[in-house]
């Protein structure tokens, strides 16, 4: 396969809340800076230190529902009263241009993404107990 035809891969990271997904991804990015991390949309309020467009796209319920209803999300879920969604177009663009991308999403979202991109998806799931 020529470099021109190479498709990017999706690395889907899923684990329970607080298991260290974000820390694992940050370490991976330090080791492999060619990876891109997908930025999700959420309706929750920003936490201290989180940056718009880097950590998340912070939107209200109406904006989220508009994106969802227009088919803009590859996957979406509700967790602890907040909505989360992965925009389809940046993921498709990364795959098309041969760039690897990391998605930090829940288990159900991972299943949905693997259905859309079965050949490009690498699924990584862990529990904190497995690491120690």
Name these PLM-found stretches.
Residues 29-38:
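Post-Walker A helix-loop "phosphate-sensing" segment adjacent to the P-loop in P-loop NTPases
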Residues 8-12, 100-102:
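Residue-level preference for the first positions of well-ordered beta-strands
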Residues 14-16:
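P-loop (Walker A) phosphate-binding loop of NTP-binding proteins
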Residues 101-106, 116-132:
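Conserved phosphate-donor/acceptor-positioning beta-strand/loop module used by diverse small-molecule
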Residues 24-25:
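Post-Walker A alpha-helix
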Residues 1-10, 33:
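Extreme N-terminal, non-catalytic leader segments
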Residues 21:
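Conserved lysine of the Walker
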Residues 42-101, 107-111:
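ATP-dependent small-molecule kinase phosphotransfer cores
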